[in-house]
Amino acid sequence: MTTDTTFLDFVGATDLVLEISPAQSDRAWQESQSFSNSSTRWRAYLNQLSLSAVLTWLQADYNFQAATGATPAALHSCWEVTNGTVVTIDGIELLLVPSEAIDTSELRVPQEWVDLPKLAPDYYLGVQVEPNEGWVRVWGYCTHAQLKSRGSYDPSDRAYSLDETDVIKDINVLWVSRQLCPEEPTKAAIDPLPTLALDRAENLLQRLGNPTVLNPRLAVPFPLWGALFEHGGWRQRLYDLRLGKNDLWSIQQWLQTRVSEVAGQLGWGKLEFQPSAIGAKGAESATAAAILTRQLTIAGKAYELRVIPHEQLAGVWRFELQTALMGDRIPGGFKLRLLTEDLQPFENNEDVATRAVERLFIEVAIEPREGLVWEIEPLPENYDTEILRF
């Protein structure tokens, strides 16, 4: 829904101005309170306003099935340390880059959204936000390839900028270009960063997790920071540390008490059974008094990831993937994989469906306090790396 722009003398004919309703503003303000300082809270507020307005517009005016492409937890972990929000439309990623600045002489994008292969989007949208007046203005866009080839890099704040003369002002051009040339490349090649060792990552987390470090993204060299930020599990832990939250991803604590609130929002839950009830499912399933489940959507269908402690062997755990619908089967080609916390494979860490099967499973012996990462191919919707701490 667009708003009356007659009072905006600076708005061009092709600019898109969207209303922020009082309800959207109130909700964004409430959601922006879970951050470490006033600066990060304000950044989260601006990002939430732009996200809410743009999603409403895409769904109302274009009937797009648009989504954030990230869970609320992942959004919070990003907004705590940098600016920008990804919106996904039919597999195309748009990064909203909100700013209060009236000056739109350049589109300025944090380096994290340009030089990290897992996070770089197809397009960047410049978004001017005016919270007091209740509107946001989408004033132009560019592709990742355009930003890399024509933009300039500023090491002082680790950002790429593109002059407004190179920014495409009419957002409708984006939709037309996608229709006429859907296969046209939008991204430049990106070299992956060196792997970050686990002990180095832990040292960085302890240092940057201190909320007195007001701008952690500039506190260490970018290769170190980028590797930490790109890893969703480490980024989530950094956010938790900066807010003084501990053991939110402890599997033992989930089983003994309850699943943490943030994990519950992501689809984790706990099921309790009588041991004999679980055993009745067959010898193939390990028995336990309680198991953990994660609800997933893959290719439009519901699945369930289960984490089951072995009844007799301490430290042995079973990961199972199965469909949520009884009698349904996992298609051939699906993969269930476990990795170390620093994303390294290990022996017998993967199960592959060579044909349609009832379930995929992996049994693994885990040391106390060891972290594991689960992966599934094809990727579940809104997937981000999670570190489960045993």
Which ranges hold each PLM region?
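C-terminal, beta-strand-rich globular interaction domains
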Residues: 283-390
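Long, hydrophobic alpha/beta structural blocks
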Residues: 90-293, 297
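An N-terminal, globular interaction/scaffold subdomain
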Residues: 24-140
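N-terminal domain-onset segments
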Residues: 1-71, 232, 236-274
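Phenylalanine-focused residue identity feature
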Residues: 7-10, 35, 64, 222, ...
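Residue-identity detector for threonine
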Residues: 2-5, 14, 40, 56, ...
